[in-house]
């Protein structure tokens, strides 16, 4: 990507970007929520569509001159519908959090009750955390995982729902390595008259590839990010398998009186003008590019390899006496409890960073340490699989990580990190980014 003009005009930003290019090229990216977007996606992100205001929706804009951004947004919507097999898509949310906010604001009033997976058990801030709008504006109740199995117990979810009687149940996670039984969640939601929202931000690419349970037949709403396993630009999206008349009593005036608004109309209005103004048309164009890529047969091959690599890593870690929360993985990530290794997540993250391996510290279920220290790390395979990682590489990477963590308290840790970093650089040369990530 040519940056001659930027180099001449703003050396500070140019130097920061150049350093980030070097970091992405020469280190192993194992943060589960990160990936490498294609050059085509990045070109769309940097296109002239960043200059265009387009409040509203295709064919119903508040600004003139939107005929070409309309084409881009319609392509993005149509491709997303085909990719996920759904009737309704809104590609305008700026982020996954914006998408979740749009749904919550559309169907809830302040003080309404919601249920979501506890943040410390693998959930997300927007699923009811007290430091987030979802836990401040609404009465949030959190379900967790079983202490013994590390998995969600649907019997306990049902018990809580029957006691709490929430208006919305959220099923989804940011650090949970098992799949979700969306049908079972819908059965619970129906028993208490609740809406059901699936947040598939993490496994969206695997779901699109048909490798995990499909939420569309069971959930009223499905939200996602467009990066992570979808390998697109940073952004959000809201979907519905089938549109339906809203049961909230929201109507619209017509020439003959009034009619009940479809739920799609309610969601659209909540995104714009409810919580956003002008959409990011350059990002929406890039979303369309990414969805087009995900519709190609090669994307399923990629998704299969993502899951295979994760399974191999989890098995190898277990063989080295690392505790994988829930006992293994069925998706792209794993959460490792390091308490039996006497290393905190913070220490592990920092030491691995010194060795050229990027992970994130993460709380584990029933953690006794703060979110700034944690007892675990989260590891994912999407980014390295984009670079061409196969099972043999995955096994070697586990070996790199084990060498560092095993020496964490030793006097020779600096030497170990330096040796691993040398091995990491060699692997990175064998796994070039090619058409993905920085040049």
Swiss-Prot record:
> What EC number(s) would the UniProt record show?
2.1.2.1
Write down the Pfam families for this protein, in alphabetical order.
Answer: SHMT (PF00464)
Sequence positions that bind (6S)-5,6,7,8-tetrahydrofolate: 119, 123-125, 370-372
The family database entries (InterPro entries) matched by this protein are listed as:
PyrdxlP-dep_Trfase, PyrdxlP-dep_Trfase_major, PyrdxlP-dep_Trfase_small, Ser_HO-MeTrfase, Ser_HO-MeTrfase-like, Ser_HO-MeTrfase_PLP_BS, SHMT-like_dom
Give the UniProt keywords, A-Z.
Amino-acid biosynthesis, Cytoplasm, One-carbon metabolism, Pyridoxal phosphate, Transferase
Q: In which pathway does it act?
A: One-carbon metabolism; tetrahydrofolate interconversion; Amino-acid biosynthesis; glycine biosynthesis; glycine from L-serine: step 1/1
Which PROSITE patterns does the UniProt record give? SHMT
Q: Where is this site: Plays an important role in substrate specificity?
A: 227
Q: Which reaction does it catalyse?
A: (6R)-5,10-methylene-5,6,7,8-tetrahydrofolate + glycine + H2O = (6S)-5,6,7,8-tetrahydrofolate + L-serine
What Gene Ontology terms describe where this protein resides (cellular component)? cytosol
N6-(pyridoxal phosphate)lysine occurs at 228
Location relative to the cell: Cytoplasm
Q: Which GO terms describe its molecular function?
A: glycine hydroxymethyltransferase activity; pyridoxal phosphate binding
Q: What does this protein do?
A: Catalyzes the reversible interconversion of serine and glycine with tetrahydrofolate (THF) serving as the one-carbon carrier. This reaction serves as the major source of one-carbon groups required for the biosynthesis of purines, thymidylate, methionine, and other important biomolecules. Also exhibits THF-independent aldolase activity toward beta-hydroxyamino acids, producing glycine and aldehydes, via a retro-aldol mechanism.
Which PANTHER family does the UniProt record give?
SERINE HYDROXYMETHYLTRANSFERASE (PTHR11680), SERINE HYDROXYMETHYLTRANSFERASE 1 (PTHR11680:SF35)
On assembly, the entry states: Homodimer.
Which family is this sequence assigned to? Belongs to the SHMT family.
**What is the protein's given name?**
Serine hydroxymethyltransferase
- Tell me the organism: Chlorobium phaeobacteroides (strain BS1)
What gene is this protein translated from? glyA
